[in-house]
Amino acid sequence: MRNFDLSPLYRSAIGFDRLFNALEAGQSQGNGGYPPYNVELVDENHYRIAIAVAGFAEQELEITTQDNLLIVRGAHNNEPAERTYLYQGIAERNFERKFQLAEHIQIKGAKLENGLLYIDMERIVPETLKPRRIEIK
């Protein structure tokens, strides 16, 4: 597992204020880090988000995209049962998580497996933006 320290970029980057503000805003969302998630680089052009959604059924989860924003919502459909807890360590609250997507990122699919919601993404760069080799004659 790798963690990245972005602080050296702050010292040498000029004109990227929006990018860093977006990164900081994503880290300090007001939902207290619930539910926890991982963002994985699968290979050069493929990414996967894994969100811990234990206790949510597939029909209680909603994934939408709009303007390069991925929104994942979880809402319990039923009324909470009257229970007496001696200790409650499993959160049962609804949530909304937002992820800012870079240009040319497309959602390829999602699956719910063993309490984790996996969202697979791919970066598809148009041919016009890819570097091309010019033949010298």
Curated annotation (Swiss-Prot):
It is found in: Cytoplasm. It holds the Pfam family HSP20. Residues 28-137 form the sHSP domain. Keywords: Chaperone, Cytoplasm, Stress response. GO terms for biological process: protein stabilization. It comes from the Bacteria. Associates with aggregated proteins, together with IbpB, to stabilize and protect them from irreversible denaturation and extensive proteolysis during heat shock and oxidative stress. Aggregated proteins bound to the IbpAB complex are more efficiently refolded and reactivated by the ATP-dependent chaperone systems ClpB and DnaK/DnaJ/GrpE. Its activity is ATP-independent. Monomer. Forms homomultimers of about 100-150 subunits at optimal growth temperatures. Conformation changes to monomers at high temperatures or high ionic concentrations. This is Small heat shock protein IbpA. It comes from Serratia proteamaculans (strain 568).
